[in-house]
Amino acid sequence: MRSGASAPLAMTDTGHGIQAFARRQVGRLVGAGMFLAVAFGVASLATWNVADPSFSHATNNTVTNAMGYAGAVFSDLAMQFFGLAAVAALVPAVIWGYLLFSARGVDRLPKRGLFWFGFALLAAAIAGCIVPPKTWPLPTGLGGVFGDMVLKIPGVLIGGYPTGLIASVLAVLLAGPTLWLFAFGSALIGRKNGFAVMEEPAAADPREDDLLFDNEEDEGDEGILALGAITHWWLSLRAWMHRRAVRRRQERDEYEPEMEPRASAWRRAAERVESAEFAEQRMSPGGRARVEPEFFAAMVNDRSVSVDPDDDDIFDRDDEDMDFDDEPVAQRRAAPAAKVQQFRSDAATRVEAPAPRPAPGARVQREAQTSLIGSDKFEMPSLHFLSEPKNVARDPSLSKDALEQNARLLEGVLEDFGVKGEIIAVRPGPVVTLYELEPAPGIKSSRVIGLSDDIARSMSAIACRVAVVPGRNAIGIELPNAKRETVYLREIMASRDFETTKAKLALALGKTINGEAVIVDIAKMPHVLVAGTTGSGKSVAINTMILSLLYRLTPQECRLIMIDPKMLELSVYDGIPHLLTPVVTDPKKAVVALKWTVREMEDRYRKMSKVGVRNIDGFNARVQLAEKKGEKISRTVQTGFDRQTGEAIYETEDLDLEPMPYIVVIIDEMADLMMVAGKDIEGAVQRLAQMARAAGIHVIMATQRPSVDVITGTIKANFPTRISFQVTSKIDSRTILGEQGAEQLLGMGDMLYMAGGGRIQRVHGPFVSDDEVEKIVGHLKLQGVPEYLDAITEDDDEDDDEPSGKGAGSGGGGGGNFEDSDDPYDQAVAVVLRDGKASTSYIQRRLGIGYNRAASIIEKMEKEGIVGPANHAGKREILVPTEDDKF
């Protein structure tokens, strides 16, 4: 006998006697052991629970398997690798056990074991062709990992996982080889005497060995011939189908004109639809598509099989059924689109529904009922002054099927540029639709962001903005809708969110991509920098911010200072009671107004320090509480020391304070102001931006020239909240936001809102017309006359802080001209009485004299009783009335 052959396990030529008896008993023991092993496997598989602890599932749950932890591990491994075919894989073990227990034996163990394993693989593949039910808990198919591995091979040939009719045909084709492998692996065929009891020969016959050798070769040749015949039949069938596809394409080209430029993208979309139908049918209970094993993922994903969208039915038709003359060309062109639209029609899980319209608040119902009783109080503007949103029919391009189709097409475009990934969510909105891309491992975000122009061109879109979604492993691709919806200010003003917001200075900014209302608080920002080109919606956004304040706050709660060098945008608000001064149009007076605002900020801080509060809200609450109780706010201050005892002298000072309103400074065009007085403007804006928040003073600054000479680094550092409308270049976008993206906006109110911390959000600003603004302004003018402060634009204190030196200019007030007096002492007394400051260094700076002479003058003033002695801090009290005290 040749060395490669294996003798039967229990029937070897050992002769009669004790040795043969022992071999038979060992065979029976092995057969009984196989019966027990099969019983263990069947019981384990019958009580298999995916939640049991195993090698692939670490948990502290109690084992529910009938065979304990060992049964849970075995059943989990068997179901993971073979699926339902694990039960069929145990059948050959039963037959082996029967043959061994009955002393018939199993010859050629290695070969039959290999065929047994092959039978298990094909059985798993046949099980994988069956569509799993929704309750199937594993990410693989019914054939397990091995079944999916085998199905990957025909999947490469046909361009996707076998589904439907193809899967049925493939299962039938695999049935023959599977039965043959089962029969040979189970020792049902290829045995010398079948199931007959083999009699032990009396002596070894050399001719019998030769006969067995020949039989083995014949059996091996039969197996090879069978496999060769099956392979030849399969290749012939595939070649026939390929020839039919080529012939159909040639016949279609004779009647159909040249395909559109986007036909290649449609073909790729149809190909992905074909390959995804199998995944669509295999959905787990949680709604997530099954995850295919990674063994052949690279092989399938990297394939370059060209699938024509009209070749879907080549396996179902004969040549006689194909009549291109009777079928219109338009219908054949529409076939890919129809198939893509039909895909996921029932389970479009990644397409989210748009946000509902904001719920109306109670104010709408109150204003709907006209009051017959007049009121002397300040009456807020009515919502009826604003235009109602129009009930526009929903854009059909935003249906689930259309959005799913666009998502598939976008995946194809990204794949063309070498970006692999999956669109995991689609969020439609009033203006744009957000497609969230989950890139494959190794794909850089910067690479995808740099493809924004190419994506817009390939998708036939006006613009495309690409940005990373914060806090998620996704990249957002924003594409404009075919039909843009208009966001109306009334829709946000009348919403319950705007009415019930706790924001002190609420601004109706617009809507997000999903259609949700965006309401921000300028008191927390605390300042806003707005930039954008002409026509981008910047001025309309300024109007919506102003109207947001006018609809919620009275003149006692909020006052406005408007600076409009263009003399067009904000002049319509001139005369409303909320203004502290008429709309400033002169750039020089704008500088004076900003300096007054700085002085007002400092004065407010002095008042708050006297009361002992830290912000305007605490100050107003303290004053209102005192008014409610009928008390006066007072404080105890140290006025000096007793000359005899040296003890400190304290006095009680009554403070006559009133609640302070918020002040919002609105600068419509910063570029014009920077051209006239850049340093003064920048210094005043810097001080306001750094310190004015606690004083209740906030700045809204807009510019249409977002360059570095207008938006300097100092201004950017103190304006953490910025809004960018459409700009002309990436450089301008980086100047405003620190990153690109604003150049891809659509204009007409489309903006990027960057809150503190660098979080950027795309917002669609509401629209308000000039007629609506004029109606609201006309109503406000009827409520009262504005109380202007002339000091805001008066330039009488411009040179107060400049050192005069010798021959300095006029000091203003009652100080007169120092050059008119030759005595420095008289000049020093005039300075002290006018400015209320008495110190050696101050006199030295104001008169331009030396330190020793200034010290002598201060000592002379002390002797004459004009100033008091210096305290522990070096400050002196002025004992005679100053000019401020006279008035």
UniProtKB/Swiss-Prot annotation:
GO terms for molecular function: ATP binding; ATP hydrolysis activity; DNA binding. It comes from the Bacteria. Its main location: membrane. Gene3D superfamilies: 3.30.980.40, P-loop containing nucleotide triphosphate hydrolases, Winged helix-like DNA-binding domain superfamily/Winged helix DNA-binding domain. It is found in: Cell inner membrane. GO terms for cellular component: plasma membrane. Keywords: ATP-binding, Cell cycle, Cell division, Cell inner membrane, Cell membrane, Chromosome partition, DNA-binding, Membrane, Nucleotide-binding, Transmembrane, Transmembrane helix. One of its GO terms (biological process) is chromosome segregation. It is a multi-pass membrane protein. The keyword Amino-acid biosynthesis does not apply. Residues 794-823 are annotated as: Disordered. Residues 185-887 are cytoplasmic. Residues 515-734 form the FtsK domain. Residues 806-817 have a biased composition (Gly residues). Consists of an N-terminal domain, which is sufficient for the localization to the septal ring and is required for cell division, followed by a linker domain, and a C-terminal domain, which forms the translocation motor involved in chromosome segregation. The C-terminal domain can be further subdivided into alpha, beta and gamma subdomains. The alpha and beta subdomains multimerise to produce a hexameric ring, contain the nucleotide binding motif and form the DNA pump. Belongs to the FtsK/SpoIIIE/SftA family. Homohexamer. Forms a ring that surrounds DNA. Essential cell division protein that coordinates cell division and chromosome segregation. The N-terminus is involved in assembly of the cell-division machinery. The C-terminus functions as a DNA motor that moves dsDNA in an ATP-dependent manner towards the dif recombination site, which is located within the replication terminus region. Translocation stops specifically at Xer-dif sites, where FtsK interacts with the Xer recombinase, allowing activation of chromosome unlinking by recombination. FtsK orienting polar sequences (KOPS) guide the direction of DNA translocation. This is DNA translocase FtsK. It comes from Mesorhizobium japonicum (strain LMG 29417 / CECT 9101 / MAFF 303099) (Mesorhizobium loti (strain MAFF 303099)).
